[in-house]
Curated annotation (Swiss-Prot):
Pfam families from the UniProt entry: ThiG
GO biological process: thiamine diphosphate biosynthetic process
UniProt enzyme class: transferase
Chief place of localization: cytoplasm
Subunit text: Homotetramer. Forms heterodimers with either ThiH or ThiS.
Reaction catalysis annotation: [ThiS sulfur-carrier protein]-C-terminal-Gly-aminoethanethioate + 2-iminoacetate + 1-deoxy-D-xylulose 5-phosphate = [ThiS sulfur-carrier protein]-C-terminal Gly-Gly + 2-[(2R,5Z)-2-carboxy-4-methylthiazol-5(2H)-ylidene]ethyl phosphate + 2 H2O + H(+)
Record's function text: Catalyzes the rearrangement of 1-deoxy-D-xylulose 5-phosphate (DXP) to produce the thiazole phosphate moiety of thiamine. Sulfur is provided by the thiocarboxylate moiety of the carrier protein ThiS. In vitro, sulfur can be provided by H(2)S.
Database matches in SUPFAM superfamilies: ThiG-like
UniProt name for this protein: Thiazole synthase
Organism of this sequence: Cupriavidus necator (strain ATCC 17699 / DSM 428 / KCTC 22496 / NCIMB 10442 / H16 / Stanier 337) (Ralstonia eutropha)
Any one GO molecular function term: thiazole synthase activity
Amino acid sequence: MTFEPSETLRDPFVLYGESFGSRLLLGTARYPSPATLEAAVQASRPAMITVALRRQGAVGAGEGGQAFWQMLKALDVPVLPNTAGCFTAQEVITTAMMAREVFETPWIKLELIGDDYTLQPDTLNLPAVAETLIKEGFKVLPYCTEDLVLCRRLLDVGCQALMPWAAPIGTGRGAVNPHAMRVLRERLPDTPLIVDAGLGLPSHAAQVLEWGYDGVLLNTAVAQAAYPVNMARAFAQAVEAGRTAYLAGPMPEREVAQASTPVVGMPFWHADSTEQRA
């Protein structure tokens, strides 16, 4: 069957039984202005936009956050609240409950931070907190590492999608452990995996989509770019290109060269010299 780019439109991105038209999720913090954020969302048309209930100094905070929230609602993009800044299970649960009431959604991006320097998730307590939130009716998307055992444990407690990092939050380094990330994808073929944290360039996003990851979540890479709106658009294009490449079935890597032009049809003297060199 001939593959056409338009077939990506028939390749739904499904989370907890809901289909989304984009495989890009976009954070809403650290933009130069509310207008820039709004334009970036319009340029990238993400599946969801993430919002931290506990954020400090967020755009619109000077107006009590009301103007900011009204702007987000006007964008007509589903909101994914997160528990950024939470270091204990109780903080996460309290924040999630408040977010569900404020944003009127059962979706929650679970962030339980274990170290305030690396912002690495608390992998020991993360599964238990995820299980508690799921029992409370939340659709949990847990921020985690690429550790396969941890990811399996999160699935065991009821998570239907995972958000492993590529690198520590805000570093922009891309996938620092590509082997582990590719193994994770291979070992969990039926689990939606969204790369969260560490991506800095559109090429980073395209790469993980080429590996078979289902989506990416971005914030700093867009918000702190010299031209955030252009970067948002570039990431959206990279995500689509990466997914299209994955579906197209990339050629396997080889250790040795292999001529792309066949010997058949070449002048006989060239074919003879080629055979002699072989």
